[in-house]
Amino acid sequence: MDCHPAGAHYNKDRLTPDSVSRGFISVMKKIRILVTGGTFDKKYDELTGRLFFRETHVPEMLRLGRCRLDVAIETVMMIDSLDLDDDGRARIVQQARTSDETAILVTHGTDTMVQTARALATAGLSAKTIVLTGAMVPYAFGSSDGLFNLGSALSFVQVLPPGVYIAMNGQHFPWDVVRKNTATGFFELVNTP
């Protein structure tokens, strides 16, 4: 999905207001978004009161956020992260590995986000910047943190050095020093010695 206006690409031969911001050149990277489901993409069935998956909300969210980035969206799976096993994580790793893009954003359920981040970080993808994000409240509810988290993660994936990160609530964390605090509903740094 190309969600930036025509002519917004960086042209190394001609600097434009789109390519220069506050004294530095902003080179637009193509970003691969790997969709895996999670609360981020759940819908609510009013008749049964159950949450379920149909299709991703990411294209709509990018449109509402007036995204100007060059992104490719790929649905890898639509699953609750509590149901995600090692085979599912291997699929996510494989999609990241075969992606031509070096900037990869993964939408993911928050319960096992750190485990998937670990799988990506130990898969030999050291030349790529991979950011995982999700939501505590489904986007379909309207009061979701998903749109904010997606926007933050899109910014982080463009500027962070290669590595694997988790981006939630406007913050980013290296994958190996973060945990989800189930009492507060926030991600936080792990106490390290």
Predicted regions and their residues:
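Short, flexible coil/linker elements and helix-boundary hinge sites characteristic
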Residues: 10-12, 124
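Short, positively charged and aromatic/hydrophobic N-terminal segments
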Residues: 9-10, 23-24
